[in-house]
Amino acid sequence: MGNTDNLGSWEQIRRGVVEVEHLISQKQFNASMVKSLEVLDLMVRTLAEKACIIDTDLMTMIDQLYQNHWISKPTCEHYHRIRTIGTKALNEGASNAYDASQAHQLLSQEVYTFANEF
């Protein structure tokens, strides 16, 4: 059952990245940043479950994954940057090409790491 769940999560993550790319190409920068946050949230919750980390807020789970050596320091920093960009888009309506592109670039890099290591 765990394998099926992981495959389902992986497929959602993969589709989420494709959607982020599509939103950026349509110049829907706010929506792309929010979607990046959603994909990050799914990745972090998937890892947290594997690491037996209690489901709390995203920031805390990222920190706990790093402290428990599930993710590297650069990955932790990337996760927090994506989280910050996405949260700003969600709460403040931020919508700019630079942040959307940065979130997408970091997310793509970390999805690649996620796919190869987990």
Can you annotate each of these PLM segments?
Residues 1-29:
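Charged alpha-helical initiation segments
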Residues 9, 32-36, 75-78, 103:
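Amphipathic alpha-helix face/heptad-repeat signature
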Residues 25-26, 68, 92:
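Charged, alpha-helical scaffolding/interaction elements associated with membrane systems
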Residues 30-54:
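Hydrophobic alpha-helical packing segments in soluble, helical-rich domains
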Residues 34-38, 42, 60, 84, ...:
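Amphipathic alpha-helical interaction segments
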Residues 48-80:
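Short, charged amphipathic alpha-helical segments flanked by flexible coils
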Residues 77-118:
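Charge-enriched, short contiguous segments at helix-coil
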